[in-house]
């Protein structure tokens, strides 16, 4: 914001040109002109403060000499900072060259009131804020587009405000004419009133509130802060405005045009100074009163109201409405800074969004890379856990086997102890028999010795067999110890491996958990950032939509400006035609005047004719003033066309277009009013010309001043031709701008076509989505069929598992029954062997007693011992075979139990897998139902959005058709307005207005009101159109989001379908594996049946052997009961050959121990 600025008074310098050259050279530092005439006189008035431009009036009193009117330069000359400013632009014969002063100082002339003071050549003023001509330090100017900064700042304490009007220039001219003794020249009448000297104070004007352009850059205003003087109450920055051209219309209209010019963009000041030269009077230095505090809306409203109200005959309501309209048109300029900040921050936000998106993609990739490793580690952990369970089961099984082997070893030791006791008893019996033999007769001693030797050999063989059995037992014990050590080492190594794997799995799981937590945290942070960025993006989208709406509004305003430019072109063409007609009329009148002047020279003779000639000269001056006003009007139209060209060139600055459009509209209204006033003045001019013709017809003696008037008219004609060329150039520029606007229109049509193509693409994408939905329905049907097949396979698996369970139960029952039978048979064999041993012991005792009684019982004893040996050997062999069979059966039973447990576990696994598959299938069905519902909802939304888009399209078409109709109506109304204006122009030729003029004016007002109503309706339609476009954009964004959601769901469904297919393949592989296991179990059952059959055959053979042994024992007992009497019979019956034959018949070898 700019600092508050105090008012700055303006100085006026007045210099009489006819004063001596030396004095003028002393005061102003100018060199005397070489071709200066002695009779040149006039008044040079410089108004300091209006953009530093001088105001010059030069009059000449001699005949045939040139007199110059009012001229103010429109802009400074471009030059370096130290270049001096030119004061006047005069012809060669009247101009005086300017003297260059120091760099950075302002030029000035000396008034007649300030002679005698050496510093008065600088035009210093007391009671003002700063020196008008002192050096002004330049600072960086900040261009503010806010309307609130344009108001006059508050006054400082003690600052003197001169509110009295300036003395007019006419009074100064009149004073000079009286000093020369001549007659009053120039404009006389309403400005002949001279004020007292004490009331001739300089006033402050709002013109000084405009920023002064620096010499370096005329586009940006740079405030200058002159050094404060002792007489000033405060110092503040005071800019200077551009001069405003004036004409003969009302002063209120002038001030209104001045306000409109001050509200323009500062870049209009960069025009060529030669183009922006206007002629004006210092009437713009008006009285101003104190205003409200600066920076407030009320202050601006009060200033605008005071400017528009003064000198105007309009009502207060209309003036207030105009003030509010100006404020509304200028208000959007405040919003440009916020939009610029938003656009500046948009790039940074986009970069942040890209960085966050890249980080999110990296985290997702890392997670995707870690996911298979995590799954593999989980699978390895499960496998290691299963292996640990399997090793634990193997350890328990080995422990059970060791326990069984220990019990078997204890049983073997007991049996060995029993055999040792039997052997010791037999040895005692043999010793007793030896003693008996020693005591017995000699012939029987040799036989007994042979028997003893045989029994000794048998005992040695028994001892060797015992040793072999003990060695086998020791070897078994060593093997058991080695197996125990190996099992312990293996179990320890497996425990270490399991512990290592468990620790590794724990570390991996912890790392995975940490990485998952970090990823979840990062994802949460990214999600939060994404939400923030999405909120920012939504805000930016809203702002972009608002800016797009504003751009649409600017485009509409631009179109309106274009139409207004066309209307201005048509008005310019009409003015050109009127100018041509006026030129033709002036040429005809000049020819008539020349003819009449020639006639008047021939017959001029009296004082009455001289007076009439002077009156005619006065009328000619009035004609010149009217021509000057016409030229000013043409310059106004040229400035309007240049402003229109600049507005079209500044198409990129959309924010400033509204203010320019408002200014153009207001200028158009001002131009229309000026055109009406100029038309009235033209009518008055025509009437004056008619009166002049009548006077010329009456006088016919006017000769003097005709040639001068003719020269002036020629100059005016040349100037008119120059203005005509300028207007043609402006028209060419306007045509070029029309071409650029047509290109912009084509670009907008291309954008509309692109939007239509986008809608067609959306329709195609919707069709693709419908096809994808149909494919998903087909995939669901396929999944349903796969689910039915899986259920059938599950039923088959359940049946096979039940059948296998039944078969396993039968096999287990059969093996248990066979084991019980074998155990019972073994127990029977043990009891029989025990009874036989007891019987043998009892019989041995009996035989010993009988041997004691008779020596003939020795042979029986020997036979009995042999039989006992044979039975002992047979029982040992049976025990060994039974033990082996028992071990084999126990191993087979354990194997069958293990296989049954494995099959049971596999069945449990299968049931669990089947249950999990059922759960997955049910969950997938639920998800499919949910997806179907969501897809249906999405299709409904898409259909609704399509209907809404169609409805909005139809509404847009209706709005466009309505807008076209309104434009057509507007064009027709404009044509009617032009026709009415033409009629008014044709009717203005009459002196007395007709009765239809008021009616035409009322019709014109009605047409203008209709145009305003149509403009309002057009704005309403544009606002509705913008709302509809915003709704279409929202719907398109919503459709894109829903499409993205549908694509995501489709991808998820495809992934789930692939997972289901993979699970189906795994289930098929599991089914094949179960079929292989079933076949393997069947083969093992068949092998078990064969082994059972072999065992049963062996058991039957053992039963036959036991039956034979029982029969043999019964035969031997019968032989013992017969009581053989002689030793020969004993020897014949129980000789070694008979014993060997018995042994061979029974199938038991004596050396098989």
UniProtKB/Swiss-Prot annotation:
Chief place of localization: other
Keywords, in A-Z order: Acetylation, Cell junction, Coiled coil, Phosphoprotein, Tight junction
Coiled-coil ranges (or none): 343-1110
Region (Interaction with TJP1/ZO1): 44-57
Region (Head): 1-342
Modified residues (Phosphoserine): 86, 126, 128, 131, 146, 205, 208, 324, 1125-1126
GO terms assigned for molecular function: microtubule binding
Compositionally biased tracts (Polar residues): 1115-1124
GO cellular component terms, A-Z: bicellular tight junction; myosin complex
Region described as Tail: 1111-1153
Comp. bias regions, Basic and acidic residues: 207-220, 772-796, 827-853
Residues bearing PTM N6-acetyllysine: 562
BP-aspect Gene Ontology terms: microtubule cytoskeleton organization
Location within or outside the cell: Cell junction, Tight junction
Motif window: ZIM: 38-52
Region (Disordered): 17-37, 131-151, 177-253, 755-796, 823-861, 1110-1131
Its biological purpose: Probably plays a role in the formation and regulation of the tight junction (TJ) paracellular permeability barrier.
Swiss-Prot/TrEMBL domain comment: Deletion of the TJP1/ZO1 interaction motif (ZIM) decreases but does not abolish colocalization with TJP1/ZO1.
Family membership: Belongs to the cingulin family.
Quaternary structure note: Homodimer. Interacts with TJP1/ZO1 and SPEF1.
This protein's name: Cingulin
Provenance organism: Sorex araneus (Eurasian common shrew)
Gene: CGN
